[in-house]
């Protein structure tokens, strides 16, 4: 979803000859400062948190772009045997190992990497929230990877920039389930944009809050 939005955002400058009619984004990540604050507040630091796998992966990027940053200086001795595998493991494996070890934020880190990660996540943002093509935004209310409030922040900022966004909330679905679970509505959207139909969106009545 993030790649789909980023492609549409970069396209006018990078590939203006590409005719992008619409964007389907189910479970879109959004790393604005406000969204990151809300995300962190929803994750108690003293409770097991499999989402830490994303933090570990982001820290490998920090080592590449932040002079002097060393992951080992932030990760606890207890968590290091797991975290050190991140350079050779995919997210699925890291998440499973993090979950099995019941790592919490407090147990994983001996000093917080929040400032560094904030700068890293800023590099994962979209260059322009004003996107010419309309967006189908599918959100699972049970999504923990890209939670509803994160996607709501994306919608607010995209709508404020003038992007047409049509949001759909699926109350019983999580991050993985929302892709197939939204197919009926997303296919209708795709057919409409290829037919040249006007897409109104629901910026004024978002179901995401």
Walk through the language-model features, giving the residues of each.
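Short beta-strand/loop motif that positions the catalytic acidic residue
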Residues: 131, 135-143
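C-terminal catalytic histidine-bearing segment of alpha/beta-hydrolase fold enzymes
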Residues: 37, 109, 113-114, 118-119, ...
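Loop/turn elements at helix/coil->beta-strand transitions in domains of secreted/extracellular proteins
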Residues: 18-22, 131-134, 161-166
């Amino acid at each position: 979803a993030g790649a789909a939005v980023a492609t549409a955002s970069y396209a006018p400058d990078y590939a203006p000859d590409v005719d992008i009619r619409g964007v389907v984004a189910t479970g879109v990540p959004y790393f604005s400062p406000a969204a990151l604050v809300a995300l962190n507040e929803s994750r108690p630091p003293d409770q097991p948190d499999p989402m830490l796998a994303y933090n570990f992966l982001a820290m490998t990027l920090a080592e590449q772009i932040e002079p002097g940053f060393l992951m080992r200086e932030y990760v606890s001795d207890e968590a290091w045997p797991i975290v050190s595998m991140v350079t050779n493991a995919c997210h699925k494996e890291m998440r499973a190992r993090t979950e099995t070890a019941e790592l919490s934020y407090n147990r994983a880190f001996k000093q917080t990497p929040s400032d560094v990660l904030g700068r890293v996540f800023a590099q994962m943002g979209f260059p322009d929230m004003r996107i010419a093509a309309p967006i189908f935004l599918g959100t699972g209310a049970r999504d923990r990877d890209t939670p509803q409030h994160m996607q709501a922040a994306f919608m607010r900022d995209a709508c404020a920039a003038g992007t047409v966004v049509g949001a759909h909330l699926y109350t019983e679905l999580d991050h993985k389930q929302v892709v197939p679970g939204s197919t009926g509505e997303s296919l209708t959207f795709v057919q409409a944009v290829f037919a040249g139909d006007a897409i109104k969106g629901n910026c004024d009545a978002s179901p995401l809050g």
